[in-house]
Amino acid sequence: MTSPIHVNSEIGKLKTVLLKRPGKEVENITPDIMYRLLFDDIPYLPTIQKEHDQFAQTLRDNGVEVLYLENLAAEAIDAGDVKEAFLDKMLNESHIKSPQVQAALKDYLISMATLDMVEKIMAGVRTNEIDIKSKALIDVSADDDYPFYMDPMPNLYFTRDPAASMGDGLTINKMTFEARQRESMFMEVIMQHHPRFANQGAQVWRDRDHIDRMEGGDELILSDKVLAIGISQRTSAQSIEELAKVLFANHSGFEKILAIKIPHKHAMMHLDTVFTMIDYDKFTIHPGIQGAGGMVDTYILEPGNNDEIKITHQTDLEKVLRDALEVPELTLIPCGGGDAVVAPREQWNDGSNTLAIAPGVVVTYDRNYVSNENLRQYGIKVIEVPSSELSRGRGGPRCMSMPLVRRKT
C-alpha cells in the first residue's frame, strides 16, 4: 500500500501540500488578547487572504496540488460520522468552565453544516452570538468584558506546526501554548476518518496525547535517513528523544537525528525560523543562533545498544551536516547577508523561513529583499510572494505549508 504521505527531504519536488486560508479568526484578534494568541499585530483580512491566495496559486503554477485543512477536516468528520464526538472533544479542550455555556455552544454548533461548524470553531464564538440565561454562580460571576465563549485560532494558517510529515508518516503534535493546543485536533480527525488518509498506510509516529511538547516548525527532513529537530521554545529535548526511540524501533528508515539547540525566544520560536534547507548542499541560517566561530550546540542521536539512544555532542554545525548528508562541501547562507541590522530585521519577517519546492528553488517573502538577492547570488531560484499582512503572524512560506508528498530526490 502506497502511503498518502511521503516526505523524505526538505527539497524534493513538492507534489501535494496542506494549507489553511486565513479566515474570520484573524478578525477576531484584538489588542487585549493578541499576545495571548501569540500575535504581535492584527492582520488586515482582505489583504492577508489575497496574499495567501497568491501564495497558493504560486504553488499550483509550479505543479503542486493544494489541499485545505478546513475542507479535509469537514470531509473527515462527515465520512466518519463523528460530528458530535469531534465537537464534544473540541468543547472539552476549549476550557469552558460553565456546563450551561458548553451545552448552549454544542446546540449552536451542531446545528450547522459540517464545514460551517469547522470554520466557526476556527473563527471562535463570541458571547453575543448565543443568548444564555443562567443564574448559576459561575455564569453570573463570568467576565462580562471578555468577548468570546470559544477563543479564535488565528495561527491555523501556519499548517506546518500542528502536524509534520516524516517519511511515510507524520507526527500529530502536542502544541506548547494553550492558544494553539486545539489545532492538532483537525489533523487527528483527518488521519482517523478521511478516506484519503485513514487506514491508507500512513504511520502516526507521535500523537497529540503526549505530555511533552513538539511542533512541526522544529522538524526538518534533511534526507531519507537524517532528521534535524530544534530544541527550542516550542519543542523539548525529551520529546525529541521519545520520537527517536519510536523511529529507530519501527523501521522508519531514519537512522540519525540532529537535535539543534536554538535560543528559547519568540523571535526564534522554531528551528525553521532560523535555519532551512534549500538545496542538496545549501542552507539558510540566521547568524543569531551561532556562537563564537559559528558554533551551534548540536546533539546527534543514533540507535545504540539494547534499544538505547546514543547521543554525541558537537558544535561545528557545518561539519555535522556535511558528515550526515555525505557531501564534500556545504554552504550556510546567512540571513540578510549577515549584516548586523539587516539580518535580525529580515529574520523577524522570516527571511530564513524559505519553502523549497524543488532542489535549489524556493518560495520566499518579497519584503526580505536582501536575503532574497543573497540567495540568488548563490545560484538559488527565488520565487517571491507578497507578504505585508502574512508576515504579521511571525511565520513565512515554510510555516504556512505542510508538505504531504514530495518526489524522492
Swiss-Prot record:
Pathway: Amino-acid degradation; L-arginine degradation via ADI pathway; carbamoyl phosphate from L-arginine: step 1/2. The active site is at C399. GO terms for biological process: arginine catabolic process to ornithine; arginine deiminase pathway. The keyword Disulfide bond does not apply. It catalyses: L-arginine + H2O = L-citrulline + NH4(+). Signal peptide: none annotated. SUPFAM superfamilies: Pentein (SSF55909). Pfam families: ADI. NCBIfam families: arcA, PRK01388.1. This is Arginine deiminase. It comes from Latilactobacillus sakei.
